[in-house]
Amino acid sequence: MKFFNLNALAAVVTGVLLAAGPTQAKDYKSITIATEGSYAPYNFKDAGGKLIGFDIDLGNDLCKRMNIECKFVEQAWDGIIPSLTAGRYDAIMAAMGIQPAREKVIAFSRPYLLTPMTFLTTADSPLLKTQVAIENLPLDNITPEQKAELDKFTKIFEGVKFGVQAGTSHEAFMKQMMPSVQISTYDTIDNVVMDLKAGRIDASLASVSFLKPLTDKPDNKDLKMFGPRMTGGLFGKGVGVGIRKEDADLKALFDKAIDAAIADGTVQKLSQQWFGYDASPKQ
């Protein structure tokens, strides 16, 4: 086995750094932002194939504040982080939760949205008869009483067929908290909803910011939300912009722009427009 002479290596590195001079902040003129394109109302395509939604509107607003020209591109969810780290685009705005596992790989802006998670089933499902004593459940600060209530609630899912989008915090939560439940994973949330309505699965789990607009639609009266509204834990710290770890200057630009968009009510206005309620973080 070979060993490095650490003193010699340190001297070489120091010399290289001195020769290179101080690090210069990157001057961003234009960036490319990836989004999934199939997660309404965050990001989806209109009849003409144009990307629209909350993420798109907010992203364009942030880019104006940063004085940067931005281009949105569509990227399948399962490859969205690997393609960022590979340099195929500069940022991600795709309803992506700021979660510990993801933070090991990429950096995030400050949260631009806060939304709890809850369950979805059909209007005729016996699951709706379940009584739960907890309406809001912060998983980072769960009390013994809340944990007992959650355990009692999750027991109703024995024998229930669950469907969730693959690679999401919803899948991670189900596998950790309900390992005995039968879980099917899907490439898009739209396919989850389609199978739920067709009776191929019994329930799902997603964000309220996705589920409320979904269940408010007249043609989705057969779908109902139920159960506690959960935050924190595996669901993370909110929704943020995904950025490469080495692009700290870009993160700083997004953080400043998001602060301003929250302060002047833009995030609140857009969340009311797209989700039907205020999901903006507080300053």
Swiss-Prot record:
Source taxon at top rank: Bacteria
Disulfide bridge positions per record: 63-70
Presence of the UniProt keyword Transcription regulation in the record: no
Pfam families reported in the protein's UniProt record: SBP_bac_3
Compartment(s): Periplasm
Cellular component per GO, a single term: membrane
Membrane-spanning ranges: none
Keyword terms: Disulfide bond, Periplasm, Plasmid, Signal, Transport
GO molecular function, one term: ligand-gated monoatomic ion channel activity
Entry annotated with the keyword Chaperone: no
Annotated signal sequence range: 1-25
Assigned protein family: Belongs to the bacterial solute-binding protein 3 family.
Described purpose of this protein according to its UniProt entry: Component of the nopaline active transport system probably consisting of four subunits: Q, M, P and T. This system is also capable of transporting octopine provided that catabolic functions are induced with nopaline.
Protein name: Nopaline-binding periplasmic protein
Lineage, top ranks: Bacteria, Pseudomonadati, Pseudomonadota, Alphaproteobacteria, Hyphomicrobiales
